[in-house]
């Protein structure tokens, strides 16, 4: 087996390396596969990991994301793969090379685990063809740059093997720990894996039709307990991540469950063809389920093979149809994505379909026989599918489509020839599969990766240059502050996008950030201050910001390639310079008032309101400038400007002040995904592109002589959507007054770690203190050793009150439920070890006390139904409102009672009542549960509304009480005249 496992690793890696050689991808050239999200996100996040081991950062909190955020959700989503530890020993500029090696290793290991699974299922058979197809499936190739997803793909065959072991009455060790690891390494794909394991378990349970019912029930119990143990083992990362996601983009809406058809069923079949993906389809295309034409042909032959029982064919056909339906029907697709529509990279559960596709094809291969009529049917089916694909113009890479069809018929000819001659066909099919998968892999890289034209050397030179100047700054000033930069990593590609997470590469406290778990409330605040926000991204403006927003957010330094007016240049290295903000304030300072209105879309008005409230000085920094607007070749309808050629939009401003003039045009919608590029001119001189995806914030128009007129002109095509336009002067003298007032009482903070700050402040009287750190229940503030309450301000930041005197402050962050998660994982680990060692003895004890154990198991499952439904509803509804609180609790009760009745009737009390007796029994069951529901409501009201216990904790306490009461009522009052099936004690 060792030789086969080695080949299953070497072969896919060698194929990819050969393609890299031809396409001049690193290590054979300067191109890179690390594009799109891996270039903008993962490179930065993984590099940041090093600072948690060797720097002052830790795994609890980070100030390198927006204004600061809980690091656990980001850690759990992006960084838990053990392969990432390899990167901490390399310099930042080499991170892309290291990650490329890691991707190759992961794809190779996909082949190894699949080969291991197949060898256990088909000992001594030649299965390399199928493990190769798994390793090089389109999912792995097109999503290889999502390297944190690949760990679960590696583990999935082992998880399935673990389920097989459970059916074979072996120890559940493999299943428990591989399932736990898949969730730990990436909880998002881990949840998909859990659903995949459930699908396989049901499939296997139906397929194994010869087993006695008691044995099937034993398997069900063993699988259920093992699944729960695997899930609870991951709670140390899953629990704090889940609660940390409450302010992220992952917000469920009932409107998401609208029944929509995403793609036609035939598209699913088309996507099984080699090179069945066109340009850009990784963003919003069909499922990535191609794994070679050999697999596709063997799959068809499976359903025509007379050696395979008809029942097996029907079960497998239903399975594939159901899996295909998850690509077609929106609510089913959403089920695999946490009930949220993916922003891009659709059908992320496609690897489950591919796995079943391959194991069915492997079964077909093991039962191959020569049947002339069947082989003709296969040829006709392939021909018809090919014609339909061509006629309906599905998105294929046209240059390889002909090769795909030709290859299909070559495969058929070879299969017919070798089967007819009764020769060994495995080596020939493997060679064809290698050629086929090479075409598919090359197509994937060419059409979806290479067009970005990223360069390893450009990235390396950029990182070295920027890292050097930031290190120079840190040697000069190692205090706690924020800094930002105004240039992108590669100016000719996606302006202001590639460098959005540079604060994590270079380990500085920045405000620009993009990830899938960021706090949306912080992003909204940044938008209110005039920064660009787009879905889960927040940007420091390419052309800078206002001095006031820099002051309020503690931005002390700006790294820029251009001269930065009003700031002092302190470092110059090559074409880069660092400028110091003369109006810098620390992370915390004294304010007069915390009741502030920032609901306007006008960032200048919002900034005025904030500083006036903070200082008590009723003078505006920003003064409105009137303007006139005109347009050419444009039709205006409400906020929309449309043109059939080149539209021109002109603003004219007569200068009435010598101060800096700013402008801002608010985007048209809350999520702001609408954008159209327009060329911006100032007095007919091209300045920049505006209304773009990444450049749509406050911009300075400079200082101008009083009495002159400046013209701001936009040239655009098609249409622009503009909600409001603002022109304001920045009065530096008034800004100075506000700054002097705020700078009088600042906290002198010192960073101990990223989750612990220490500071000092001296106050002459009791005062309110403002922290420009996002409000989070995880923060604990000790002042002179005593705990002080923190309050939200500006919807998302933090404030607190202090008495007069000299104070020492300690600010410590502990992610919500992280301690509870660790305790649950440790207890579960102990139970898992005991369960694995004693599982046979436990089963014997179970058969003796079957009713009690079944009730406890069903009780746990019922509790999960209640908890999950309640947690979802409590986040959909405002549970602070008593009506919605009761509605959420009522619906969760109805769902759990329905589940409990049928499961208790069948598995616990084994009631066989029918007709009127069954109705009476159901009535008594519902009545008893209604009684415990009333008890549930009363205790919940007391705990949540009167005692003020956290509603989640309260729900857990109440469920334990209700669990005990329900058993007593069911045993003594409901299932009193039941007839039971006798259990085969010998089983």
Regions inferred by a protein language model and the residue ranges of each:
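Periplasmic/ER-lumenal interhelical loops and adjacent helix-loop junctions
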Residues: 40-49, 82, 219-221, 230-306, ...
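Start-transfer (signal-anchor) and selected internal transmembrane alpha helices
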Residues: 1-25, 218, 222, 417-429, ...
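A cross-kingdom signal targeting lumenal/periplasmic-facing segments of multi-pass membrane
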Residues: 86-87, 112, 508-642, 650-666, ...
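Membrane-embedded helix bundles of polyisoprenyl
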Residues: 16-17, 103-117, 125-208, 220-247, ...
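Active-site lumenal/periplasmic loops and adjacent helix-entry segments of GT-C-fold
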Residues: 22-121, 126-157, 181-185, 280-282, ...
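Extracytoplasmic/lumenal acceptor-recognition loop(s) of multi-pass membrane glycoenzymes
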Residues: 73, 433-457, 472-550, 584-585, ...
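Active-site-proximal, structured, solvent-exposed surfaces of multi-pass membrane proteins
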Residues: 2, 45, 621-843
């Amino acid at each position: 087996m060792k030789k086969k496992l080695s080949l299953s690793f070497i072969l896919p890696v060698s194929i990819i390396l050969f393609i890299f050689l031809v396409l001049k991808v690193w290590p054979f050239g300067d191109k890179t596969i690390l594009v799109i999200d891996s270039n903008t996100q993962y490179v930065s996040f993984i590099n940041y990991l090093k600072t948690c081991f060797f720097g002052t950062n830790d795994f609890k909190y980070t100030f390198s994301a927006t204004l600061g955020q809980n690091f656990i959700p980001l850690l759990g989503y992006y960084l838990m793969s053990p392969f990432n530890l390899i990167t901490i020993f390399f310099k930042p500029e080499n991170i892309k090379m290291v990650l490329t090696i890691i991707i190759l290793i992961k794809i190779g290991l996909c082949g190894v685990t699949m080969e291991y699974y197949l060898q256990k299922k088909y000992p001594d058979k030649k299965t390399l063809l199928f493990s190769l197809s798994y390793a090089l499936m389109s999912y792995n190739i097109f999503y290889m740059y999502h390297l944190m997803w690949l760990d679960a793909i590696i583990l999935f065959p082992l998880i399935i093997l673990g389920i097989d072991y459970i059916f074979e009455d072996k120890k559940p060790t493999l299943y428990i720990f591989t399932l736990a690891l898949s969730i730990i390494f990436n909880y998002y794909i881990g949840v998909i894996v859990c659903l995949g394991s459930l699908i396989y378990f049901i499939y296997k349970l139906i397929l194994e039709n010869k087993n006695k019912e008691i044995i099937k029930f034993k398997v069900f119990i063993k699988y259920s307990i093992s699944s729960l143990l695997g899930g609870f083992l991951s709670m140390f990362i899953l629990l704090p991540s889940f609660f940390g996601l409450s302010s992220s983009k992952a917000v469920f809406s009932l409107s998401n469950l609208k029944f929509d058809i995403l793609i036609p069923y035939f598209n699913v079949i088309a996507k099984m063809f080699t090179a069945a993906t066109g340009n850009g389809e990784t963003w919003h295309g069909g499922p990535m389920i191609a794994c070679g034409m050999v697999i596709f042909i063997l799959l068809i032959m499976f359903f025509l093979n007379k050696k395979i029982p008809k029942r097996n064919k029907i079960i497998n056909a239903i399975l594939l149809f159901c899996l295909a339906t998850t690509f077609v029907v929106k609510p089913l697709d959403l089920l695999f994505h946490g009930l949220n529509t993916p922003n891009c990279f659709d059908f992320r559960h496609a690897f489950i379909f591919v796995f079943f596709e391959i194991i069915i094809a492997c079964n077909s291969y093991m039962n191959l026989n020569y049947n002339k009529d069947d082989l003709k049917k296969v040829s006709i089916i392939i021909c018809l599918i090919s014609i339909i694909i061509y006629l309906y113009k599905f998105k294929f890479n046209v240059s390889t489509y002909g090769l795909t069809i030709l290859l299909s018929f070559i495969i058929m000819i070879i299969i017919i020839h070798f089967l007819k001659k009764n020769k060994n066909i495995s080596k020939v099919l493997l060679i064809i599969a290698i050629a086929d998968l090479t075409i598919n892999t090359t197509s994937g890289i060419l059409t979806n990766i290479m067009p970005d034209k990223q360069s390893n050397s450009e990235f390396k030179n950029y990182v070295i240059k920027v890292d050097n100047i930031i290190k120079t700054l840190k040697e000069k000033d190692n205090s706690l502050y924020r800094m930002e930069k105004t240039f992108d990593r590669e100016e000719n590609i996606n302006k202001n996008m590639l460098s959005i997470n540079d604060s994590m590469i270079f380990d500085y406290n920045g405000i620009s950030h993009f990830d899938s778990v960021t706090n949306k409330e912080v992003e909204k605040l940044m938008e209110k201050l005039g920064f660009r926000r787009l879905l889960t991204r927040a940007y420091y403006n390419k052309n800078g910001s206002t001095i006031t927003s820099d002051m309020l957010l503690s931005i002390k330094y700006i790294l820029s390639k251009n001269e930065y007016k009003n700031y002092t240049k302190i470092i110059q290295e090559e074409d880069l310079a660092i400028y110091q903000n003369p109006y810098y304030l620390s992370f915390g300072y004294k304010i007069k008032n915390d009741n502030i209105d920032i609901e306007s879309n006008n960032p200048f008005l919002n900034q005025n309101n904030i500083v006036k409230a903070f200082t008590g000085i009723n003078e505006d920094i920003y003064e409105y400038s009137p303007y006139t607007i005109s347009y050419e070749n444009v039709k205006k309808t409400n906020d929309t400007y449309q043109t059939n050629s080149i539209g021109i939009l002109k603003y004219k401003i007569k200068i009435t002040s010598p101060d800096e003039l700013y402008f801002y045009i608010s985007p048209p919608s809350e999520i702001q995904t609408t954008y159209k590029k327009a060329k911006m001119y100032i007095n007919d001189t091209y300045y920049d592109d505006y209304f773009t995806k990444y450049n749509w914030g406050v911009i300075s128009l400079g200082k101008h002589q009083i009495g002159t007129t400046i013209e701001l002109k936009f040239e655009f095509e098609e249409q622009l959507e503009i909600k409001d336009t603002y022109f304001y002067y920045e009065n530096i003298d008034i800004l100075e007054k506000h700054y002097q007032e705020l700078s009088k009482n600042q906290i002198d903070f010192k960073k101990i770690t990223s989750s612990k700050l220490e500071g000092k402040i001296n106050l002459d009287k009791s005062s309110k203190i403002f922290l420009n750190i996002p409000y989070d229940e995880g923060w604990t503030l000790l002042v002179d050793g005593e705990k002080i309450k923190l309050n939200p301000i500006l919807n998302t930041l933090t404030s607190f009150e202090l008495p007069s005197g000299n104070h020492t402050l300690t600010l410590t962050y502990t992610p919500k439920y992280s301690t509870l998660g660790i305790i649950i994982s440790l207890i579960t680990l102990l139970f898992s070890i005991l369960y694995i060692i004693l599982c046979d003895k436990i089963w014997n004890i179970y058969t003796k006390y079957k009713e009690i154990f079944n009730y406890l198991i069903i009780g746990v499952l019922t509790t999960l139904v209640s908890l999950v439904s309640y947690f979802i509803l409590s986040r959909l509804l405002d549970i602070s409102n008593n009506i919605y609180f009761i509605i959420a609790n009522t619906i969760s009760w109805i769902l759990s009672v329905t589940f409990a009745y049928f499961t208790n009737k069948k598995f616990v009390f084994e009631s066989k009542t029918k007709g009127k007796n069954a109705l009476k029994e159901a009535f008594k069951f519902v009545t008893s549960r209604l009684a415990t529901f009333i008890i549930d409501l009363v205790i919940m009201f007391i705990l949540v509304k009167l005692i003020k216990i956290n509603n989640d904790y309260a729900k857990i306490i109440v469920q334990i009480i209700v669990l005990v009461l329900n058993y007593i009522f069911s045993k003594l009052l409901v299932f009193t005249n039941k007839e039971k099936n006798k259990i085969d004690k010998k089983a």
